[in-house]
Amino acid sequence: MEVLRMFRKGAVAFSQATLPLLLKGVKQESKYPPSLIFTGATASVKANAFMSSFNTGKYALRALSSSLAKEFGPQGVHVGHAIIDGVIDIPRTKEWLKDAGPDAKIDPDSVSIT
């Protein structure tokens, strides 16, 4: 359940820290509406066997983004949930797809600012 705790605490803390800044962007009448985009996976809409913690965390993240969209959308902040599937090349996935080509895994820098 550590995965669920990580998804929940990280996303909520990030939202709490960024939404006040995004609301300021609305007040400044930015040319582009401020946006908060969460990245999910197909697991957020379809469960997989042996992935209960991951599935639960992704479902929770999708629910959070949906709730925030309903709460902050009318105030001018766009909140979205994008499904991006693939194995991210991190130490935990080192052995996954090891015999596949160099493009089989996603570079972590291509999906986030690190």
Label the model's feature ranges.
Residues 14-18, 22:
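Hydrophobic positions on the long internal alpha-helix
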Residues 8, 12, 58, 105-112:
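Electropositive phosphate-/nucleotide-binding environments in soluble metabolic enzymes
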Residues 74-90, 94-114:
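C-terminal helical subdomain
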Residues 18, 50-53, 58, 87, ...:
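Residue-level preference for alpha-helix termini and adjacent loops
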Residues 19, 54-55, 63, 95-102:
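Generic alpha-helical propensity signal that fires on short helical segments
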Residues 1-6:
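Active-site Tyr-X3-Lys motif and surrounding loop/helix of classical short-chain dehydrogenase/reductase
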